[in-house]
């Protein structure tokens, strides 16, 4: 599978080199336009006809279908319930569809403050209340503000390319844009499965070439203690 060939490299440098060979835009693409408040894509960027026109080669199917979701920062203050402002953007099931969507939405460095961009397996909603996520938790990596673009891409490629030994445990990933830092998290299904969580955390650091310690928090603890929730596992 094309995407598997893309991300079999275990270092960020090797991965970056191979990505350019699969990405239709490559490294010579123009910079994204500036983002308006609460915007994730331009008016016509995700028009279905534009996406269809880009899929000119024989498609390379992914093992799972995935859905991008977006939480608009300008809508959050108007919602009484957490997660009520999250909306699906597009569901993709091939390598070509992934690149068509990825190249036409703003990357983390271009998103507005307090925006959240998700990529989850199809039919799994990025919410604690989703039955698949309810008993899970998350690994989190922190980046300086505006420096998470590569980490986000490498995380996406590792997930959709099924490069994690315990990939069945993964629900999806989210990048949170906050003041002073960006946070990328991988959500998993069974927080109590320590061996699986340890494997995911260790491999994720290898894919990102990330040397600092990262922590895993149970969703139940996050709901109870919010920002004061403590890490249960470390990698």
From Swiss-Prot:
Keyword field contains DNA repair: no
Complex and partners: EIF4F is a multi-subunit complex, the composition of which varies with external and internal environmental conditions. It is composed of at least EIF4A, EIF4E and EIF4G. EIF4E is also known to interact with other partners. In higher plants two isoforms of EIF4F have been identified, named isoform EIF4F and isoform EIF(iso)4F. Isoform EIF4F has subunits p220 and p26, whereas isoform EIF(iso)4F has subunits p82 and p28.
Main location: nucleus
Gene Ontology biological-process entries: defense response to virus; regulation of translation; translational initiation
Cellular compartment(s): Nucleus; Cytoplasm
Residues annotated as binding mRNA: 78-83, 110, 128-129, 178-183, 223-227
Region ranges (EIF4G-binding): 60-63, 70-106, 154-163
Database matches in InterPro entries: TIF_eIF4e-like, TIF_eIF_4E, TIF_eIF_4E_CS
Pfam families, per the entry: IF4E
Protein species of origin: Cucumis zeyherii (Wild cucumber)
Post-translational modification: According to the redox status, the Cys-133-Cys-171 disulfide bridge may have a role in regulating protein function by affecting its ability to bind capped mRNA.
PANTHER family: EUKARYOTIC TRANSLATION INITIATION FACTOR 4E RELATED, EUKARYOTIC TRANSLATION INITIATION FACTOR 4E1-RELATED
Keywords: Cytoplasm, Disulfide bond, Host-virus interaction, Initiation factor, Nucleus, Plant defense, Protein biosynthesis, RNA-binding, Translation regulation
Family indicated by similarity: Belongs to the eukaryotic initiation factor 4E family.
Polar residues: bias regions: 13-24
Name this polypeptide is given: Eukaryotic translation initiation factor 4E-1
Any one GO cellular component localisation term in the record: nucleus
Function: Component of the protein complex eIF4F, which is involved in the recognition of the mRNA cap, ATP-dependent unwinding of 5'-terminal secondary structure and recruitment of mRNA to the ribosome. Recognizes and binds the 7-methylguanosine-containing mRNA cap during an early step in the initiation of protein synthesis and facilitates ribosome binding by inducing the unwinding of the mRNAs secondary structures. Key component of recessive resistance to potyviruses. (Microbial infection) Susceptibility host factor required for viral infection by recruiting viral RNAs to the host ribosomal complex via an interaction with viral genome-linked protein (VPg).
Note: Displayed sequence is from cv.
Disulphide linkage map: 133-171
Location of the region described as Disordered in the Swiss-Prot/TrEMBL record: 1-37
GO molecular function, one term: translation initiation factor activity
